[in-house]
Amino acid sequence: MKGLGDSRPRHLSDSLDPPHEPLFAGPDRNPYLLSPTEAFAREARFPGQNTLPGDGLFPLNNQLPPPSSTFPRIHYNSHFEVPEESPFPSHAQATKINRLPANLLDQFEKQLPIHRDGFSTLQFPRGEAKARGESPGRIRHLVHSVQRLFFTKAPSMEGTAGKVGGNGSKKGGLEDGKGRRAKSKERAKAGEPKRRSRSNISGWWSSDDNLDGEGGAFRSGPASGLMTLGRQQERTQPRYFMHAYNTISGHMLKTTKNTTTELTAPPPPPAPPATCPSLGVGTDTNYVKRGSWSTLTLSHAHEVCQKTSATLDKSLLKSKSCHQGLAYHYLQVPGGGGEWSTTLLSPRDMDSTAEGPIPCRRMRSGSYIKAMGDEDSDESGGGSPKPSPKTAARRQSYLRATQQSLGEQSNPRRSLDRLDSVDMLLPSKCPSWEDDYNPISDSLNDSSCISQVFGQASLIPQLFGHDQQVREADLSDQYEAACESACSEAESTTAEALDLPLPSYFRSRSHSYLRAIQAGCSQEEDSVSLQSLSPPPSTGSLSNSRTLPSSSCLVAYKKTPPPVPPRTTSKPFISVTVQSSTESAQDTYLDSQDHKSEVTSQSGLSNSSDSLDSSTRPPSVTRGGITPGPEAPEPPPKHAALKSEQGTLTSSESHSEAIPKRKLSSIGIQVDCIQPVPKEEPSPATKFQSIGIQVEDDWRSSAPSHSMSSRRDTDSDTQDANDSSCKSSERSLPDCTSHPNSISIDAGPRQAPKIAQIKRNLSYGDNSDPALEASSLPPPDPWLETSSSSPAEPAQPGACRRDGYWFLKLLQAETERLEGWCCQMDKETKENNLSEEVLGKVLSAVGSAQLLMSQKFQQFRGLCEQNLNPDANPRPTAQDLAGFWDLLQLSIEDISMKFDELYHLKANSWQLVETPEKRKEEKKPPPPVPKKPAKSKAAVSRDKASDAGDKQRQEARKRLLAAKRAASVRQNSATESADSIEIYVPEAQTRL
């Protein structure tokens, strides 16, 4: 210990100066934001390097005035002071702890979060400790933090392990170890929640909790508590650090010592025996590897701590990924060793076998292993990179509940990369974390490094509940998945930790510290793998998250960005993640809905549900997704949405994660997509419009249709609306199309008259009014046939103008049209010798038209005038007029049908089509016969009867068609409006 302390720059100036020399390389940086007071009187705790005064080992927090820390560090004295509960007893106790069942150790590990990471700057108010309790994400946080702690602790433990037994002072350590250990046991029994209890300490999760507890030792002084890596300096920290850590610190210490010659021989294996008796102190080389690795991590963390908080933020971003790499590395350690071997393998063994036992039993049995093994292994299917559907579903629900967890599942690829970074960590003794991390990044690809670092891949299998014999290849997949989830969660927690007040993010915060420490490595990885950042946060698609390598999901998950200002800087990445989250939310939807969109794939518009889903899920996306948008593109569903956003109607059906820049489709775009879908029938192109417009169109169309079931009213209304909408090239086109389709009867023959009528109508002064123009429909059929055909009605204002004037204009147009037809038919009758039947038809049509104009039209005109007369006592409302007009439309349609027939006859040289016409007449006369006894003795009477029957039939048919059309129009408009409105509102809300 002394040698280590001497060789290493002292983190603690012999005074309580806030800037303490880092354990490693004596980084000049002060602990993040730690006030001098809170900077930990490392000397007090860690008397310097060599001296391990029991009192000096008191947790820095205890020694330091609580208020001094930049972040209100609630002094963890409460929990720190519970020496007996200290999870890290003296070496003897540590040995006991090591002897303790893995479950207890796991519990302790879970509880360990109390350890300060030694980054006092990164203190965040701890949320309810319990809140962190059970979520897999939290477990992963714990795992990662434990891993990080392990890495960081290795160096600090190296300093502390031998002498302090990991308890700060042996005396305090024993007390704390016992008391804490007892409490740890209780916590172990209690489970994760107890670990959460740790958060209770000050109600704040501070990086110090992890790093201080874990890395505080190195800060305080190698001698005092390196083993505990935290502020083990006191029983308080020791409490938090199990002897596993102490052992690790011992092992790591050795490793560090070996790795860094400056680190004098780590305290004799006493710590290792105590901490990892089962592990047994393996070759120093093993320790060296692990130790150096942890040393690097620790030194990185330490340096990070000493760096400015800004550096911390930057490093956090980096270290987030880098640390994930480390954590992933643990997870990924390909190891043949089915279990953590009791003895650490020599570096050669570890290198050769990649199965070297994990240096720390804590690593072996740590709850983080369980968390990783149970959750990740389950999710990863014990070897499969992807979680089982059940696991994924569980994750999704759990992630939804704890958005933080989403990150867990999103970083499979990145985790491997980062894990690889561990290799670099191993070799470097106390290089600047940036330097180390850059090489680490370079070496990230070496799984062997990971295996070396971890010694045993077996840990990974354990973590994943995977066959311990699984090799790197399999493990890498599993680990990617598990690490992805775990690391992504860690990242998410880190991201959250950045924000963090979230209690569950303590680990992540600690991770973020390590990540910050390892920022260099993680930066490369982060930048290298947009996937890791861009992978859509698991939020949207937990299932996708596996495929999505990014751990960026972390961000998305954090619904509550904690106020931690220093972390805020890192948050941008989180934001990126958020973008991804949104995307992943979309991905989830888009996965299902991209298929939908593919199915619907209307102009490739993203489904409203997709956009809604994505927008809904990622409130955080909205928040943070902005930056990461490009990275987020991974979810192809989002990609589809993105295309729509770009305005590309091409459905981006591909769920390809290839589009890294996939952006959340704007609500408007998605809305557009949505609208086309609701419009079903209408051409998507026309429907592709802003929802608001569509809604109005629908409303306008629907309003008239609602006012009257009469198809004519609907037609006229739709005609008006459709004319305007057609002009606007919106869904009106489909409507118009439907109307023309609705009536094709004799359209050809009538077209000329219609045109003439239109011209005639146009000639009228009223035509200037759009309503009048609209009314200047060709023959009545045009109402049915082509509501859109009426060019005269360009203005939807008609809908707004539905008053007496508007209806008068419509009435005038209809009157003129009917009069024109009547005049034309009279002329035709005079000019041509028509058969009695034809004459009867002509007379019937003309008479019906004249009767309608003379009676109902006049009545309607009177109603319109009354409507225009404010003084009219029974003054009819526009709705009344619309209803009456609907009734008139029925009559007009009947007459129009008659004139259509006449036009057909005219086209046929006024020759009745015997076959069809007479057959129809004959067929129809029978009904008339029953209704009206077939006593007609004259052909005329028969013609009349046939005409009457035909007329009735036609009228019935017309009414039926009108009703169907009106219903269809209303249904379409209602559906469109409803869909567009529903979608639009959610979309807007989501966007908001």
Curated annotation (Swiss-Prot):
One of its GO terms (biological process) is modification of postsynaptic structure. InterPro entries: SAPAP. The keyword Membrane applies. Its main location: membrane. Keywords: Membrane, Methylation, Phosphoprotein. Residues 528-554, 600-620 have a biased composition (Low complexity). Residues 162-171 have a biased composition (Gly residues). Residues 1-31, 157-225, 342-396, 527-751, 763-798, 915-992 are annotated as: Disordered. This is Disks large-associated protein 4. The gene is Dlgap4.
